[in-house]
Amino acid sequence: MRYVTAGESHGPEEIAVIEGIPAGLHISQEDVNEQLARRQRGYGRGERQKIETDTVTFLTGVRHQTTLGSPITLNVHNDDHNNWSKIMAPNEPATAENTLRKVLRPRPGHADLVGGMKYRHREDLRNVLERSSARETTMRVAVGAVAKKLLSEIGVDVHGFVVNVGPAKSDLNELTKYKNLQELRVVTEGFDTRALNAEADEAIKEVIDKTKRDANTVGGQVQVIATGMPVGLGSYVSADTKLDAKIANAIVGINAFKGVQFGGGFDNAEKYGDQVMDEIFWDEERGFYRGSDNLGGFEGGMTTGEAIVVRGVVKPIPTLYRPMQSVDIDTHEDHRASIERSDTTAVTAAAVIAEAMVAIELAKAVLDKFDADNIERMKEQVAVYREEIRKF
């Protein structure tokens, strides 16, 4: 399985093409639109979300809500393009009229300046920010929806939520209350902040409100949990086959993500071995299992069968309504950075995006191990493998 996305933030469309999805997978627009709506929701989002109503269209690879085995093309229309049609016109030459909203004062923390240098976009840094914008993650969530649908066929569930926004934190001890991810999902999706309880929800809202009043932005952390993965996906034989490494790459590849950990993560660095390693047990029904999950579901780059637990660190959004020091790339004079419409925080949306990226990497791993042209054949292979593992 592989995919590519295309599109600019204020261009006409966002597009994704997916290859490698087996034939016979039932997938509807509603399956994808539900995930796109989750991405748009969340406390601290900006005015752009009031303009857009993200809905997907399948252009290829799906017939009668069933995949054909051929490349799947999806697109989402950018409603805001109506306000930018001249400025983002692909088929018209540059004129004084359609270059009015040039960006010449790069924002600290954004791709503006370095991207302009790399691609020689000396005339207008908008050529950088239109693609480097997190608007592109719309299509990663859409691809993730397809991946989640495939994973659900073999009993794998994936869910993301917010750990903290600034100093306001969810109590992770709350996780022990839930028997499965569906119970957790009902709770966290019931809060605008995707927090674990009402107390954390209110505290996070207070932080976001204060940040907005201060014309500032704020970051946080999100966590993704996946359950039901077969044992032994990924491999120890080469660095580039380790599944946790692939997930780490996918998480840090999301806009604004600056760190990733698995299980106990960085806290494990302050502990001793007998406090961290997940002891091994066996019973006739379950086969081998672990007594804890401090390593986040991975050993040697391979899934252990325990829950996969991934956390990502999200920096504050670099577009500030009280802009920071910058330099005009034309005059080289000191100026405040450009202002683009933005969110106060995108941590609530980041939980959904991280969930999608984990799902994509897990789906890739499943299809690498159980390569099949049809979804039913894939499920048969998984069932045989699970039984083999159980009897080991």
Swiss-Prot record:
Keywords: Amino-acid biosynthesis, Aromatic amino acid biosynthesis, FAD, Flavoprotein, FMN, Lyase, NADP. GO terms for cellular component: cytosol. The keyword Protein biosynthesis does not apply. Reduced FMN (FMNH(2)). Pathway: Metabolic intermediate biosynthesis; chorismate biosynthesis; chorismate from D-erythrose 4-phosphate and phosphoenolpyruvate: step 7/7. It is an enzyme of class 4 (lyase). Pfam families: Chorismate_synt. NADP(+) binds at R39, R45. GO terms for molecular function: chorismate synthase activity; FMN binding. CDD domains: Chorismate_synthase. Coiled coil: none annotated. It catalyses: 5-O-(1-carboxyvinyl)-3-phosphoshikimate = chorismate + phosphate. This reaction introduces a second double bond into the aromatic ring system. HAMAP family: Chorismate_synth. Belongs to the chorismate synthase family. Homotetramer. NCBIfam families: aroC, PRK05382.1. This is Chorismate synthase. The gene is aroC.
